[in-house]
């Protein structure tokens, strides 16, 4: 055992730091209580939400309305300009701009004088206050009503920036450190300095062609390295700044900004907080202008020569991101990755399944030295969604130019940039900007202007498919519910239910939905350019619906298949709404110039794979992430889990625990079952993570563990857990004094899931107590429906105030009065 002088405090502090971060709360409401674990939505709220019109229906309702011609500025924080519901609203100032602080609960309403009837788009200047890692969510109401369902879920992103390290570049054999420094300064790294024989400089705020060439030549990296030269993921921090949000669909199904119909005169605009605080600087109602097409854009810059610069932007060094979950990733699958190295961890890409949700974005900043037309080329990989192209919207922002100047941008440069396509392929690809066809797009860039390119996840052409499939799924689900109301979940296959006579509308609707799915399958094939497993899924469900809708005899025998396919369609819908894309780099290059290769030749690929195979025998995975060698004063921690979890834990140690305690941690990833032999050999760790709670006492009674209740902050830390979670980790000694030998890593908690559509259809409120749940059973059973009840006995025991163990854990407590009563209550639920 190492470091006995630091053993107890180190073990305790490390456990507390990690476990508090992982803590999940056990929430079981007592009988008859209505705590925060239950929904507060009433039946009327649920019906309003389910029956709300979509934006498509809202636009159809106001199809004859014209766009407004004037812009209206809302007085956001003037005296008497607004009314609030809730506490915490106040006027604040950020970066010289005054705004109204809105907390994460409550609502604020502004009264706006509109000069004319018409359609208005809305933009909000906001400042995301530092808080949790989640995005900001708001509900918009116009004249005290939510105008359409999509306005219930407005998501405003925060601004996150990685804390990159200074690059350290060693001079080559034929140059000195001073010569290398001079070259770095000439390239634009003006802060370059010589330290310990290396040239050190910070990551630039804006990449230029000269900087890009210098970085490629000298393999410049801005990540912290561990003792084995593996790159470590940088810390991402919120970097609040004033940002502009244009009200649009958070799901990404609708590419255009929302337009709201407002009548002339007084109107009320309300924002209701759902998640996270923010400060509102301004709200503007403005007439939405159509974005020019690429044809119009290219005519504007017709005759412009090609630019001369080439700037490679490594995606892992993005300037900013919308979420903390967007961080650099390692990919060693290809010899042409930039950079590629199989001997160590190199964080050379960004995205993947971390960059797949609508609204997520990353930004990269650059400048070119010569004006002209440029191709924006990306090297990417999309091997997740078979037969589905993923989509990104590209926004360009220019700094220092004003509207009307050549090369000025303040959003999407042309309409097609809202739906840039990245096709499916199992290999890496390189392509110019395109919308899924052979036609590519060029952009004009002004010289010496700082440009920021934002790539945002959107559904693009898949948005219409997703919206249609969602509507079809709703119809099919309603048809299924109508059938089981008559037949029950297990119908009699020998009975003639007479579906065509008893529910003709349902039979007709199944045929209608089959035709819609057939059309959607053709549409999906056209988008992807080929048939896929997803197309086959839609066609299969369409055939099933057509059979059931046209023949009564096929309904009962296919009912279970219909239920299964409803789930399959839901899975397809979920997959189609994700847009994963792994990005290696973006290259700004002269229009028409040769694109870089996407994949290596045979010899390059063979050498890359053989080198990786050979290195796998010698790579030290245990020390990955360690910033210093193990010593007698370090704490040895064993972790029995996956490697990605060990990396997360190593980041917590490096960024939080060690800097705050000055205690080194030797983290080792081990296989399960290694603890027992190590203890027998007297070579066990100081801390072990991943031990089953049932094994803790087995080790404790054999004096293999130390008790932890003697630490000053034990009571405060243990209070974060339920008594039941701590009971299994402790035992009494001969003097009947309770000792504890560990802390829970995770806690489970029961949850109740309800079908809001079913409850609304049957006019049932969401049950909040067991009595209310019991009251729902007759109505459900009358419609051949049931409640899926839990068989977890402990929740009934705890809700009655009982304990699982008696006599301080020495015997089971199931034979007590409260234990028997709890068991009886659970059993009674299955006899109704």
Pin down the residues of each PLM region:
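Helix-loop-helix "hinge/cap" segment bordering the ligand-binding cleft or interdomain interface
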Residues: 291, 666-670, 709-712, 729-832
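Paired acidic/hydrophobic, glycine-rich loop segments that form the ligand-binding mouth/hinge
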Residues: 270-271, 686-690, 788
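Immediate post-signal peptide segment of exported/extracytoplasmic ligand-binding proteins
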Residues: 616-636, 736-737, 760, 778-785
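Disordered inhibitory propeptide/activation segment of secreted metzincin zinc metalloprotease zymogens
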Residues: 591-633
């Amino acid at each position: 055992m190492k470091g006995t002088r630091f053993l107890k405090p180190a073990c305790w502090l490390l456990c507390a730091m990690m476990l508090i971060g992982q803590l999940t709360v056990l929430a079981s409401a007592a009988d008859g209580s209505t705590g925060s674990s239950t929904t507060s939505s009433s039946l009327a709220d649920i019906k309003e939400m389910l029956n709300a019109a979509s934006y498509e229906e809202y636009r159809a309702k106001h199809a004859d309305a014209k766009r407004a011609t004037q812009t209206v500025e809302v007085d956001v924080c003037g005296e008497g300009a607004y009314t609030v519901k809730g506490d915490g609203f106040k006027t604040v100032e950020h970066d010289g701009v005054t705004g109204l602080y809105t907390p994460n609960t409550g609502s604020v309403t502004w009264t706006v004088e509109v000069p004319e009837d018409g359609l208005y788009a809305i933009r909000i200047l906001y400042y995301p206050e530092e808080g949790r890692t989640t995005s900001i969510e708001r509900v918009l109401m116009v004249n005290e009503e939510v105008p359409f369902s999509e306005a219930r879920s407005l998501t405003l992103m925060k601004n996150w920036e990685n804390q990159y390290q200074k690059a350290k570049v060693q001079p080559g054999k034929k140059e000195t450190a001073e010569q290398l420094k001079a070259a770095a300064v000439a390239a634009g790294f003006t802060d370059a300095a010589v330290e310990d024989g290396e040239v050190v400089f910070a990551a630039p705020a804006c990449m230029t062609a000269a900087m890009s060439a210098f970085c490629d030549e000298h393999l410049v990296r801005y990540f912290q390295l561990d003792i084995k030269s593996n790159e470590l993921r940088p810390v991402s921090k919120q970097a609040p700044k004033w940002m502009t949000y244009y009200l649009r669909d958070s799901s990404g199904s609708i590419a255009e900004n929302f337009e709201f119909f407002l009548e002339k005169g007084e109107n009320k605009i309300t924002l209701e907080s759902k998640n996270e605080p923010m400060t509102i600087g301004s709200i503007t109602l403005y007439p939405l202008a159509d974005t020019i097409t690429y044809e119009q854009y290219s005519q504007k810059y017709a005759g412009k020569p090609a630019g001369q610069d080439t700037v490679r932007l490594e995606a892992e060094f993005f300037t900013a991101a919308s979420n903390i979950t967007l961080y650099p990733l390692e990919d060693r699958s290809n010899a042409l990755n930039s950079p590629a190295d199989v001997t160590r961890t190199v964080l050379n890409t960004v995205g993947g399944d971390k960059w797949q949700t609508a609204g997520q974005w990353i930004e990269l900043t650059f400048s070119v030295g010569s004006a002209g037309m440029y191709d924006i080329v990306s090297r990417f990989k999309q091997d997740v969604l078979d037969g589905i192209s993923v989509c990104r919207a590209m926004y360009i922002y220019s700094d220092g130019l004003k509207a009307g100047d050549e090369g000025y941008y303040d959003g999407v440069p042309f309409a097609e940039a809202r739906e840039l396509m990245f096709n499916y392929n199992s290999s890496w690809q390189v392509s110019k900007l395109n919308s899924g066809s052979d036609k590519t797009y060029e952009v004009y860039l002004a010289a010496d202007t700082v440009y920021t390119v934002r790539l945002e996840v959107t559904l693009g052409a898949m948005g219409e498919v997703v919206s249609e499939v969602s509507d079809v799924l709703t119809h099919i689900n309603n048809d299924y519910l109508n059938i089981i109301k008559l037949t029950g979940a297990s119908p009699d296959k020998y009975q003639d239910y007479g579906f065509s006579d008893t529910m003709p509308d349902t039979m007709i609707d199944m045929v209608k939905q089959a035709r819609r799915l057939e059309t959607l399958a053709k549409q999906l094939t056209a988008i992807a350019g080929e048939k896929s497993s997803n197309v086959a899924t839609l066609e299969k469900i369409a055939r099933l619906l057509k059979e059931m809708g046209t023949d009564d005899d096929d309904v009962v025998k296919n009912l279970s298949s219909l239920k299964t396919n409803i789930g399959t369609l839901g899975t397809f819908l979920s997959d189609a709404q994700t847009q994963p894309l792994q990005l290696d780099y973006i290259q700004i290059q002269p229009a028409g110039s040769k694109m870089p290769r996407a994949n290596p030749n045979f010899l390059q690929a063979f050498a890359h794979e053989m080198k990786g195979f050979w290195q796998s025998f010698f790579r030290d995975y245990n020390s990955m992430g360690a910033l210093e060698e193990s010593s007698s004063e370090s704490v040895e921690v064993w972790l029995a889990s996956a490697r990605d979890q060990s990396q997360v834990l190593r980041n917590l140690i490096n960024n939080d625990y060690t800097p705050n305690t000055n205690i080194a941690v030797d983290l080792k990833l081990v296989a399960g079952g290694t603890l027992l032999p190590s203890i027998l050999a007297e070579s066990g760790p100081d801390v072990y993570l991943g031990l089953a709670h049932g094994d803790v006492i087995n080790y404790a009674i054999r004096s293999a563990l130390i008790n932890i209740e003697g630490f000053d902050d034990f009571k405060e830390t243990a209070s974060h857990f339920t008594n039941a979670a701590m009971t299994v980790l402790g035992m009494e000694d001969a003097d009947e004094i309770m000792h504890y030998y560990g802390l829970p890593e995770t806690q489970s908690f029961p949850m109740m899931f309800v079908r809001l559509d079913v409850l609304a259809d049957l006019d049932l409120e969401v049950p909040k107590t067991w009595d209310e749940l019991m009251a729902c059973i007759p109505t459900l059973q009358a419609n051949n429906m049931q409640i899926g009840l839990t068989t977890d006995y402990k929740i009934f025991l705890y809700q009655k105030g009982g304990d699982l163990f008696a006599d301080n854990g020495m015997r089971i407590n199931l034979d007590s009065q409260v234990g028997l009563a709890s068991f009886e209550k659970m059993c009674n639920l299955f006899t109704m």
